[in-house]
Every structure is written in C-alpha cells, then in structure tokens.
Amino acid sequence: DLITFGSPLTHAEFLLARSKNDLEARQKDRELATCPPIGEVLDEWQLEHARAIGLLEEGQASLSAFPDRQVKDGWTLHHGAAFAVVRWTNVHDHAKFIFCGDLISGPLSPAFGQGIEDRDLAKIDKQSASFTHTRYWSADQSRERLTTFRNAINVLDED
C-alpha cells in the first residue's frame, strides 16, 4: 500500500515536467511511473506466448512486463511498472479560495492513472474553514475524517 496525504503531485505538470504534454510524454516513455503502468506493445512472438500462458486476453496487445528468459514461462515487470503491485490511496482536502482546505494537494488520478483512489475530505465531511496542509494528523479532526484516515491505512487489511 502507498498512502499519500496532502501530496503536491497534483501539480506534477509543473513540478516534474514543463507542461501537461511533457508530463504525458515522460510517462509514455516510462521516465515517470503511472498507476496502473502504461503497457508495452509486445512483439508477435511475445503476444502469442503471453496469451498461451494466460497473461493476455484476445484483443489485448500490451503488457507491463517482458519475458524472463531465465525462468520458464516467467515474466518480469518493466522499469515503469513500479506501481503495478501497489494499492495507492491519495487523501487530499479540496481547497476553496486560498485559505480553506489544502491548496497544495489535490487528486492524483487525473495525472498518474485510474489505479489511484482519491479521497477528497471536503466531500467526505465538509469544506475546511482554514488552511489544512500541515493539519492532516491534528487531534481536532472530525470523526468522518479520522475514519477515512484509518480506512486508508487499514494496517490489518480488513474490509
């Protein structure tokens, strides 16, 4: 599990790249990882092999892995698949105006992929009345927010 609270990665198009197009190009080139990973279009022999061992369904042509020649029927995730085996939960507090909520954070799934579960505290509880970027763990959180934090962390992996 990866849990981010108040992550500035919502602004990745200027924190990690020169523009939204540059960010997308870097992700496509696997310089920056996405969740789920961007698949690699496989060669015909790789496609046949992947389908034969059940890794791909008919019609699919890409995979986030490549054949591992040292292991029979083994495949290895490519370097851009860092989040392939990760459950990513992003908790943020939607900002209204400058000082209500967390202007620094925001949803991550639009920039990094639909494998990220974004949890907006303003929708779970109510709009914050003050700046909250450094207050996620303050003792005066509402019951709804504390429950959201506990469920995101879910150390015992309970449903």
Where do the model's predicted regions map?
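Lipid deacylating catalytic domains
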Residues: 1-159
